[in-house]
Amino acid sequence: MAGMRRNPLAARRTGRPQNASVSGGASFSDFSELFGMGAPVASGQVVTPESAMRFSAVFACVRLLGGAVASAPVKVYLREGTEQRQLAHGHPLADVLRLRPNRFMTSTTFWKTFVAHKVLQGNGYAHIIRERSGEPVGLYPLNPRNVVVYWAWELGLDQRLGVERNRLFYRVTFEDGQARLYDQDDMLHVPNVGFDGKRGLSTISAAGQGIGLGLAAEESSARFFSN
C-alpha cells in the first residue's frame, strides 16, 4: 500500500467539527442513490446492485476483484522527509488493515465488502474509528446508500466553523434513523471515476442497459430450457 505520513490517518485538530447529529435536505438523486432505486432499462429489467449480482458476469467480476484485493499483501510505511519512506514494523494500523479491521469482520470479509460497494455503487466508504489520541484502531464499512457527501460550503460549515470551503463531509444515516456528520479525516473513501469530485459514478447506473440486457437474456434462456 502507498506510503503514509508519520501519523497514519491521523485526525486534524484544527477547525474540524466533532461527529455530530445533523439534519438537512437532499435532492431526489441523493435519495435515489441512498435507497438503491433503479429505473427500468430498455429490456424491462430494473437494475440495482442486488439484481445486477444475479447476472453471472457481474457476480464473477465482483468476486474476482474482491478476492484479489482481499488477498493482496498489506504494508504500512512511515514517510521520512519528502522522498524517503520506512517500513513501520509493528504499527497498530497494519493489524487493522491486514488482520481485523473491526471486531465483527476479518480483513478478507471487510475488503470484499468494501470492493463490492465500490465497483457496484461507485463508492467504497469505511468509517475510521480512533482512540482519544487520534490513532486509528478500526474500520467499519458503510453501505453507500446510507452516505451523502457534501462540500463544506454546501452545509455552511466554512462560515460557521471556518473550515476550508472544499473540505468534504459525510452524512451517514444509520439503521435507527439517526444521521451523523463525519469529517473527511474520519472516512476512508475510494470512489469510481466521477464528475463532481465528491462521489464516483455508479457502475450500475453507467452500465445499466448492458446489465439489464444480460439479465433479460439469462431469464429468457432459462425459461426456454425449462419448457
PLM region descriptions:
Residues 2-227:
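Structured, contiguous alpha/beta core segments that scaffold functional sites
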